[in-house]
Amino acid sequence: IECAGWSEDIASVDRETARECVCVDFTVPEAFRANYKFIAENFKAAVIGTTGWYDIREEVSDYFRKCGTPMIWASNYSVGVNVLSAAVDIASRLLAKAGGYAPYIVEKHHCHKLDAPSGTAKTLSACVDANMGLHTDVASVRVGELAGIHTVGFEGSCDRLTFEHEAFSRQGFAEGAVVAAGMADEIAEKAAAGENVELVNDFKDLFLGL
């Protein structure tokens, strides 16, 4: 995979080049909401790391399918975070059956991060809420230059179960996005060859084979 270029104005991208490229979007919600139709109409495929647009996820997904453009989305492309997410999914289902456990999440990031809670914390809490039928308390901390720490706990009367992921740098997020770009390109090739493939996918489901 090679970087074909970058732009602060996506409409300035050469459209012939775009048709052979996977768009990797890590911007802000307002920008993605304004640009997703252009991305779907002009790029070979897309990897979306921007969060804060999930209220229109069905609308966006339908548009990408309409355009025949593969899209992979995730709130976090770190391999470790996606394994954490799968583990939390399983644990929350089992603890819901047992009963008597209260979930909580603490997320810590660098002082420059604008959103709180993080997109990853929102994704994790949505999963736990759905599985346990409870509201997950989420606490956010912004301090120093922390790349990111997510802690998910389940507090019971007799014990506590805790899952934690700590990113040492942002490299893991970038590497996961590159993996996703390869997946998106492969889906585009299969679709072009006439294979029946799902065009819109959650990175976690693809990566973990769910």
Name what the model sees in each region.
Residues 1-16, 99-210:
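C-terminal substrate-binding/catalytic lobe of Rossmann-fold NAD(P)-dependent oxidoreductases
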Residues 26, 49-50, 156:
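Short, well-ordered coil/turn residues at beta-beta hairpins
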Residues 30-41, 49-93:
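Rossmann-fold NAD(P)-binding glycine/threonine-rich loop
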Residues 1-41:
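N-terminal glycine-/serine-/threonine-rich beta1-alpha1-beta2 phosphate-ribose binding loop
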